[in-house]
Amino acid sequence: MMRAYEIMKAPVPAELLGKWETIHYTHMINGENVTDIDILNGDEWNKQFYHTLAFSENHKINKWDRFGSQLYDQCFMLKGDNITIAGNLTDLLFPQYNYTETWTISDKTENSMKLTHEQGNTTECYTYKRK
């Protein structure tokens, strides 16, 4: 089970660690914007897209909704600019048999980050600021 050891021993970059909150959401189909929302300055409908992520050194990722309720406590691995998220380490090791989700860090500065997820002809982008 060398791969599990490699995942857990790979250092998580310091600039990714900590809490991040959503500030913008974009949903595109076939490259056309369907939804383009400024989450923090919007109305209650816009705030449904708000969440907070926390990345830790032990390859755990936590997600909370706008009310502070925890949505998940999962594992992640980083390969280049791709973050793969799964329910546990086994799911990361055998993604073909389990549900995983991969997001790409498409833009990153010290205090902001954009994560993009593509599935078929649909693209979702969340912009985060460090919390």
Language model: regions and residue ranges:
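Enriched but not universal
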Residues: A4-Y5, M28
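Edge beta-strand at a domain terminus
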Residues: Y5, D73-N82, S112-K131
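N-terminal helix-cap/turn-to-beta initiation motif at the start of protein domains
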Residues: Y5-E21
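Short, solvent-exposed beta-strand-terminating loops
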Residues: K19-G31
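Buried hydrophobic residues that stabilize the cores of well-folded domains
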Residues: W20-T22, I37, R66, C75, ...
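Contiguous, well-ordered beta-strand patches that form the walls/edges
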Residues: T26-M28, Q48-N111
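Flexible, solvent-exposed loop segments that connect beta-strands
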Residues: I29-E44, D91-F94
